[in-house]
Amino acid sequence: MGLLDPSQKEVLRFAVNCRILTLVLQALFNLIIPDHHADAFCPPRLAPSGSADQLVEGLLGGLSRWDAEHFLFIAEHGYLYEHNFAFFPGFPLALLMGTELLRPLQGLLSQRSCLLVSVALLNLLFSVLAAVALHDLGCLVLHCPRQALCAALLFCISPANVFLAAGYSEALFAFLTFSAMGQLERGRGWASGLLFALAAGVRSNGLVSLGFLLHSQCRGFCSSLAVLSPWKPLVKLMASVCLSVLIVSLPFALFQYRAYIQFCSPGSAPSIPEPLLQLAADKGYRLAGENAPPWCSWDLPLIYNYIQDVYWNVGLLRYYELKQVPNFLLATPVTVLVVWATWTYVTTHPWLCLTLGLQRTKDRENPEKPHRGFLSPKVFVYLVHAAALLVFGGLCMHVQVLTRFLASSTPIMYWFPAHLLQDQEPLLRCVDTEPGKLPQEKSPPGQKAPRNCLMKLFYDWKRCSPVTRCVLVYFLTYWLLGLILHCNFLPWT
């Protein structure tokens, strides 16, 4: 940690502590609370279970609930069933690489137990690296070290906490996405494009991140028009746009092609163990080698669209039913947060928003005073990204996933609450510090001042403003409630 500045050390320390606490609590809740008998994917265990496997299951079994079972199944058996293709291959491949590092334990543990250990260790690593990457990105975009630090600390107690620890792809996706954004802010387009492509191989919404590359290229094009004739920059823009689209969409295209070859080409059925064949027969899961599914005859045969439609009933306004009101209530806080952030930014920078962030001021001779923090002009493209994800998720997806969907995809989820804390909380309202230095707070005699601004707020809870209490209660409630419910197959997905 000698190469890290004090703020980075604080983020790293707090992130590791939160991850370890999460693993301990999920084991505790999994032990003392009986599992709910949910109608979820539950494949049979093919390997015999020894005492070491039972110990691993007892300690880490809470990480294998709901969709985590799909990722573990894919990592162990591959893409056998049609609906497995709803889950992208990036995270299962990472789990397989993790189990290779655990090869010395494979004589003691079954493949599934090794995968569970891999889930715990890799997601601890990915979520910690994501916190560090978010802090780095915040310093580059916000130009406000205190706000960047506060946002990274908030990520450590994210409302999507359980999904950053369990066998889900959110932690890996957040790390790749925040890292790609940071590389783009540094002007490293190639590195950013490759990281965005990797993220698109982890989750489908990684394709939306293509917009960051396109916006950056359009900004460069507009800047070059002031000194060059338009033709050369235009040709360069078209070439870079085409290349960006190709690079970022390639993992998705290859994944869809793999599914087409498996399900739509004759003689492509893999060998499947009998218990898994029986599961397919009992549950009606489609296997390769049977009659070709309907999507094979589409003009654009995309299995992903078909699965979301048929298996998960994902579509415009399909989730708007009276029985889903509790799930809409669960998604209300994150919706309010992003809408509030959008309104605050648009009312502060109307001209910047009208010009899509390509021209900062209407009057170049009398430019407005530059803002720092969340209201920085650089935040515009990130806000558009967050708003687009919210609109799509709210209209077309199962709304209860909005929290983890946004919390792992957009830094706005943490930048805006950090802005609220710094703007509305008198305890944090002081002169900004230089990059790399932690704020020095006054403390009572004989008591060491906390370097972590969140810990300071927890210590002085009674003096906190109502806005601060609302933000922290939201983050901590979802942080803890998600662990209690999700780890016992209760409805928190």
UniProtKB/Swiss-Prot annotation:
Alpha-1,6-mannosyltransferase that catalyzes the transfer of the second mannose, via an alpha-1,6 bond, from a dolichol-phosphate-mannose (Dol-P-Man) to the alpha-D-Man-(1->4)-alpha-D-GlcN-(1->6)-(1-radyl,2-acyl-sn-glycero-3-phospho)-2-acyl-inositol (also termed H2) intermediate to generate an alpha-D-Man-(1->6)-alpha-D-Man-(1->4)-alpha-D-GlcN-(1->6)-(1-radyl,2-acyl-sn-glycero-3-phospho)-2-acyl-inositol (also termed H3) and participates in the seventh step of the glycosylphosphatidylinositol-anchor biosynthesis. GO terms for cellular component: endoplasmic reticulum membrane. PANTHER family: GPI MANNOSYLTRANSFERASE 2 (PTHR12468:SF2). Coiled coil: none annotated. GO terms for molecular function: alpha-1,6-mannosyltransferase activity; glycolipid mannosyltransferase activity. Pfam families: Mannosyl_trans2. GO terms for biological process: GPI anchor biosynthetic process. Not N-glycosylated. Its main location: endoplasmic reticulum. This is GPI alpha-1,6-mannosyltransferase 2. Residues 35-77, 135-136, 183-192, 256-327, 400-469 are lumenal. Pathway: Glycolipid biosynthesis; glycosylphosphatidylinositol-anchor biosynthesis. The chain crosses the membrane at residues 14-34, 78-98, 114-134, 137-157, 162-182, 193-213, 235-255, 328-348, 379-399, 470-490. Keywords: Endoplasmic reticulum, Glycosyltransferase, GPI-anchor biosynthesis, Membrane, Transferase, Transmembrane, Transmembrane helix.
